């Protein structure tokens, strides 16, 4: 089939590469978000998807208004059979959805109807799910509610961060997306409506959402920190500094009797109290510095062992 691929960030790259390498499909164009300012230099930079497409000589479309009549006409002129979407980053209107004969097929990183929305991987980790996955489905106007073509599942490991889990899902999901395109082309695949039961939502994670709530039980703090690692990154205030915090370890044999947010420092460890057991900090990142071992930072900062994280 003649395909247009719509995507923007790194997790979309395995899917794009898989379709480029396919001997059954031709990626005739890539649709991605406009160049965004990135890095300290503040210069606009093409998205990862745009860079990969350009490396393969594939035309790159960067509409500022993808639902405008002008862009709908531009896409229609390409006569795509189907459009594949992985983390494009904008909602698509009816006129755009009507362009390809086989519609738009989205790869979503959850087992729908669970975790519809912008942050399904983060939501699954924060909730303590043991299994998640990826789903291909036909895009409709309502968010992530279209009929499903296929699903792959992935076991969530006890130490998974959002980055770890998304990396695995982006690879397994790429195979699912290619298989879905194959099935649509040869007519062997039919989309099945999502069940009305089991719907949950996963809105975009904000910086405020990533602030550690030390009053929560230790196992919940652990999950929530991993769910926002590496982005936007868990954080807390220690003194007057906002400190980013890497994954923590529940310390059942750690200091007892610490209040939520109370810090206990020794030569090799920093423990922080929660609503249950203490947790052991692994890495921290002070403002303007690189991540470092938490105990090393505490020594250099002369952190008061009776300090508080809040």
From Swiss-Prot:
GO terms for molecular function: methionyl-tRNA formyltransferase activity. It is an enzyme of class 2 (transferase). Transmembrane segments: none annotated. Pfam families: Formyl_trans_C (PF02911), Formyl_trans_N (PF00551). It catalyses: L-methionyl-tRNA(fMet) + (6R)-10-formyltetrahydrofolate = N-formyl-L-methionyl-tRNA(fMet) + (6S)-5,6,7,8-tetrahydrofolate + H(+). (6S)-5,6,7,8-tetrahydrofolate binds at residues 110-113. InterPro entries: Fmt, Formyl_trans_C, Formyl_transf_N, Formyl_transf_N_sf, Formyl_transferase-like_C_sf, Met-tRNA-FMT_C, Met-tRNA-FMT_N. One of its GO terms (cellular component) is cytosol. The keyword Lyase does not apply. Its EC number is 2.1.2.9. Keywords: Protein biosynthesis, Transferase. Belongs to the Fmt family. Attaches a formyl group to the free amino group of methionyl-tRNA(fMet). The formyl group appears to play a dual role in the initiator identity of N-formylmethionyl-tRNA by promoting its recognition by IF2 and preventing the misappropriation of this tRNA by the elongation apparatus. This is Methionyl-tRNA formyltransferase. It comes from Mycolicibacterium vanbaalenii (strain DSM 7251 / JCM 13017 / BCRC 16820 / KCTC 9966 / NRRL B-24157 / PYR-1).
